Amino acid sequence: LKGFFHYMCTQVNKLTANPTENISLGTPQKALPKYLTENEAVELLKNIQSDFYERDYCIIVFFLNCGMRLAELITINLGDFKDDTIKITGKGNKERLVYLNTACQAALEHYLPARAALNNLRDKEALFVSKKTGRRLTARRVEQIVANCLKSAGLDNMGYSPHKLRHTAATLMYQGGVDMLAIKEILGHENVSTTQIYTHINQQQLKQAVEASPLADTGYIAPQSKAMTDSKQDLSLIHI
């Protein structure tokens, strides 16, 4: 609308003044990212059903614990692991180290033997490979795997995706007391301002927690009687 009135004033000279010139458009509020609650994340892990369980379980565990992007997960190679860390190649080919917690290490220990047992393994370096072709998983295939796992857990109608699992990892870390700068490094964000969105999520939860109090709707309770109020005033004078 502002552009239309600007055009009418400057190009066709139909107006002498732009009535929208001093109207501020404001800054649109960013939508809070969707994420699984801790209970939903546990249910997801407990209800994975797959003909290659070890691989799919490991994928979900990595998303939920490392907060990596889909593109980062599918490019992981066996040579990217060193001790209890994994080298992740992020946007702009920038590398970062992420530590593997106990859950990630356990998932990896169960998956690697199952991967090695494949008879048709072709991409020798790729961590996550197809059981059918032996080649590195594509982004689309991982999306399907995540969708199937969510469906098995009854979470398929909530708009979740691999990127939502990344949001889940960051949110649960923040709720667990992890420093924002540490989360920034784990996620591979350029600026901490990008990571700040997770503080808004927590503030919203704090508000909801207070409003959930059974006393939240009691409102203002007036004195039961004027006599009771007067007696309290008299007692207060005694102590002066």
Where are these regions (language model features)?
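Conserved catalytic core of the tyrosine transesterase superfamily
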Residues: 1-237
